[in-house]
Structures are given as C-alpha cells and as structure tokens.
Swiss-Prot record:
Subunit structure and binding partners: Homotetramer; dimer of dimers.
Species, as recorded: Synechococcus sp. (strain JA-3-3Ab)
Catalytic class of the enzyme: transferase
Protein name per Swiss-Prot or TrEMBL: S-adenosylmethionine synthase
Binding-site residues for ATP, renumbered to this chain: H11, D169, G170, K171, K245, F246, D254, R260, K261, A277, K281
Family: Belongs to the AdoMet synthase family.
Pfam annotation, one family: S-AdoMet_synt_C
Binding locations of K(+): E39
A Gene Ontology term for the protein's cellular component: cytoplasm
Chain positions covered by the region annotation Flexible loop: 95-105
Record PROSITE patterns: ADOMET_SYNTHASE_1, ADOMET_SYNTHASE_2
Residues the record lists as binding Mg(2+): D13
Annotated positions binding L-methionine: E52, Q95, D254, K285
C-alpha cells in the first residue's frame, strides 16, 4: 500500500505558496527579467512578506495579498483571518549581487561559451527530480492524483454553495492498495475539513460530524470516483475529521510558511525529492525550472512507451549553465536499457537554465496568461494538471523518442 496527501487552497502553507506565486506572477508580468525569491508567513490576523526581489516592476503588495486571501475564501474576521482586516508587513531586499553575477554571466560565458544558452548560470546549486508513471492518464502516481482530485472537489463544493458550512482549510489523504506493483484498490480515504460549529439546526458535535461524513461521501468522494476504474468498496476505510471537530483552522489554527508542502506539490512521496521548493521563485531558480524540465523528460519517456516508470535526476552548481550530472532510472520497467535512455535524453533535451526558460517561455507565461500562471500551479500540484496547459506536461517529444529508441537501439548503446 502507498499513501499520499493533498491540501486545499485554504491550508495555511498553501495560502503562503499562492501569495508567493501571485507575487512572482505580478512581477514577471510587468518585468519578465525580474528576479524573485518571495517568502510568506501567515498567522492569526497577519501576513508577512520577505525575501529578495530585483525588478523594474512596481507592485502594490498589500493589495495583492488582500485580493488573493479573499479569492481563497478568508473574508470573515470571526474566523481569525480576513482579507481586509489582516495586517500585511512587507520586508523585501534586493538579490545579492554575488548571486546575480553568476546568474547573469555563467561560468561558461566567461570561459568556453558555445551558444546563447551558455549565458545564464544556475541560480543555486542543488539536485532536482522529475518523475512519471503510467498509473493515470496524466502519467502521475495514482495516490497523489486521487488526493488532489478530492481536495479540488472539496474546495469546489464549498465555493459553489453545495456545502455552505465548509470553511477554506482542508486536507485529504488516499491509501492505494497495490499488487505486483500495480494499483488494485482503495484501502483508506481521509478527509479533514474545516467547518462551522453548527449546521442549520444541528448543534450537537457528534451529529454535526455525522452530517459532514455523509455529505462528503455524496458530494466529494462519489463525484471524484464516478468515472474512474478503481473505486472505494465495502472494504475501504473512510475517515472524516478524526479529531472530532475542525472549527478552528486556517492561519488561526496553524502558522503557514511558503515551501512547506513540497511533497504535495510533486509526486506525493512516490518519487524522490531534491528538497527545493517551487513557489515564490522566478524561473532562473533551478529548484523550480529544472524540476519542471525533469518532469518533462520523464513524462515523454513514459508517454513514448519506453518505460512504465521513469525518474530523472539533474544537478547544478551555482553560476554554471551545464548540469553537473544527469541520471535516468526506470526501476526495471524500461523497454531499452537506462543507459540508452540517458543517451536519448542527452541528445534531445537541453537542460541548461537558459534553454529551459526559452523552451517553456517561463518568464513570459504570466503575461501571456493574463497576469496569472504560477499561482495556478501553487495548489493541487505542479504536475499532472493537464487542464492548465503547462508546457512541461506536454508529450511532444514522445514520438521522436519512440522512433529513435526502437529504430536505433543498437547504435544508441554504442
């Protein structure tokens, strides 16, 4: 069995991620060359913005915060956190010139530049992972895919009034049963959702929880699984608000920080993680852009039918354009050797930061999408949301990889 969790947009850490990425969107929309490292802290009645920004853009950060908090659903001060009454403290510095010089002019541009993609160095050292598998149509692990579906539906029934007693904070967790490496059933579903103390005339705590449990099954679980081949059954354990109630939530219940939900943001623990968060960072930061590129590589390999599972690791040195290492691992599911896949990747994917920026248009996307792009992926996962038309989710190289792998496997092996 394997478990993964997701959270709704009203979770304190996710509030921070969305504000951080709304800042990235606003700055890149006005100045695509902005350098951003925006960190956010939320607590009862307070939002703190800090980090480093170098940009020609002028942004009203206080208004941006209030608009995003209201959009998420915190509009009532009685809940301990409200868009219009919370304090907003802003404390940004500029990016360190020592870091900037390595990003602006990579080591290669000062020693052995071959083309324009050697100009930009990695914004930091680090290692990033990308992953894909064939458990779902979007080529994501099934546990995290289901957890995100439940969280998204939980937020939807709150916002559309189906369950008006719900409040913005919520979490989901799904445990999937596997046999011989393939998902075969749903072992446990867990939904914790913030709610009002009473529901209409229902005031007794146990009765409130009974109503919530029944409503969540009908309005959240059943719609999510309606058209899926694997469904909960009589053996599935269904848990809702196991503490007995969840009235106090959001920033009033827990402080939130940017970058504390990196497993929710990626593969639900199914794949390894390099440790770097995504939100609040402009795409010169390889924590973000290289993780997107690694997902793109892995997804195209699986989409090509060259493996059932694929994990890609890439690492960088600060101020250096070319990756330090590249690793392809298919866990015994590859149709050609991993060494052959590595050679294919080296031939067809350019993982220098400037090349990633150019291919995915990561600096231009906020402006192209009307001022909001990164904030949309700051909740419900940076991977697998195919409805958002994310460039790293495309499988436009799958046919090429398939053709070359099977036509020239011997040549690739050398």
């Amino acid at each position: 069995m394997f478990s993964s969790e997701s959270v709704t947009e009203g979770h304190p850490d996710k509030i921070c991620d969305q504000i951080s990425d709304a800042i990235v969107d606003a700055l890149l929309t006005a100045d695509p060359l902005s350098r951003v490292a925006a960190e956010v802290v939320v607590n009862t009645g307070m939002v703190i913005l800090t980090g480093e920004i170098t940009s020609q853009a002028h942004v009203n950060f206080t208004r941006l915060v209030r608009d995003k908090v209201a959009e998420i659903g915190y509009t009532d001060a009685k809940n301990g956190f409200s868009a219009e009454s919370c304090a907003v403290l802003v404390a940004f510095d500029e990016q360190s010139p020592d870091i900037a010089q390595g990003v602006n002019l990579a080591l290669e541009s000062r020693t052995s530049q071959e083309d324009e993609f050697d100009l930009i160095g990695a914004g930091d050292q680090g290692l990033m992972f990308g992953f894909a598998c064939d458990e779902t149509p979007e080529l994501m692990p099934l546990p995290i895919s289901l957890a995100h579906r439940l969280s998204r539906q939980l937020a939807a029934v709150r916002k559309n009034g189906t369950l008006p007693y719900l409040r913005p904070d919520g979490k989901t967790q799904v445990t999937v049963a596997y046999e011989e490496g393939r998902p075969v059933g749903i072992h446990t579903l867990l939904i914790s959702t913030q709610h009002t103390p009473t529901i209409g005339a229902i005031t007794e705590e146990a009765a409130v929880q009974e109503r919530i449990r029944a409503d969540l099954w009908e309005a959240v679980v059943q719609p999510v699984f309606a058209e899926l081949p694997i469904k909960p059954d009589g053996n599935t354990r269904f848990l809702t608000n196991p503490t007995g109630k969840f009235v106090i939530g959001g920033p009033q219940g827990d402080a939130g920080l940017t970058g504390r939900k990196i497993i929710v943001d990626t593969y639900g623990g199914y794949s390894r993680h390099g440790g770097g968060a995504f939100s609040g960072k402009d795409p010169t930061k390889v924590d973000r852009s290289a993780a997107y590129a690694a997902r793109y590589v892995a997804k195209n390999i699986v989409a090509a039918g060259l493996a059932q599972k694929c994990e890609v690791q890439v690492s960088y040195a600060i101020g250096v354009a070319r990756p330090i290492n590249l690793l392809v691992e298919t866990f015994g599911t590859g149709r050609i050797p991993d060494e052959a896949l590595l050679r294919l990747v080296q031939r067809h994917f350019d993982l220098r930061p400037a090349a990633i920026l150019a291919q995915f248009q990561l600096r231009e996307l906020p402006r192209q999408r009307g001022g909001r792009f990164y904030q949309n992926v700051a909740v419900y996962g940076h991977f697998g949301q195919t409805h958002l038309d994310l460039p790293w989710e495309r499988t436009d190289k799958a046919a090429l990889l398939r053709e070359e792998a099977f036509a020239g496997a011997t040549a690739i092996l050398g």
